[in-house]
């Protein structure tokens, strides 16, 4: 039990560290959703999985089973996540970057 708790806390800390660094983009510059995903999300969601809660992966079937079907749903979950997920506010990930990440998730997983 203690090992599980320590592992979860460690993973959450890694996610928080990953969230601390974000890319600046110039006006009109296309945002690379894959790059942003790798920078902010891949630590906890490698290959679309979920190291904290394996039942909540980014795979289409799991997303839809959890009511996440659109770009808007993904961004909403990034901004106001459930237990175990780091909150990505607008200061951490801009709306444009969040949209690029969400589009990448829908297209890739």
Predicted regions, residues:
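Axial heme c-ligation environment in periplasmic c-type cytochrome domains
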Residues: 52-62, 76-109
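Short coil/turn and helix-start
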Residues: 27, 68, 94-95
């Amino acid at each position: 039990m203690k090992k599980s708790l320590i592992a979860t806390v460690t993973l959450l800390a890694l996610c928080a560290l990953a969230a601390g660094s974000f890319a600046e983009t110039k006006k009109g510059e296309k945002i690379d959703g894959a790059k942003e995903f790798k920078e902010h999300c891949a630590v906890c969601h490698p290959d679309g999985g979920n190291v904290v809660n394996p039942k909540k992966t980014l795979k289409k079937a799991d997303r839809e089973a959890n009511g996440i079907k659109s770009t808007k749903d993904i961004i909403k979950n990034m901004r106001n996540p459930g237990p175990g997920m780091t909150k990505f506010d607008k200061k951490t990930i801009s709306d444009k970057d969040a949209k690029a990440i969400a589009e990448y998730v829908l297209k890739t997983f």
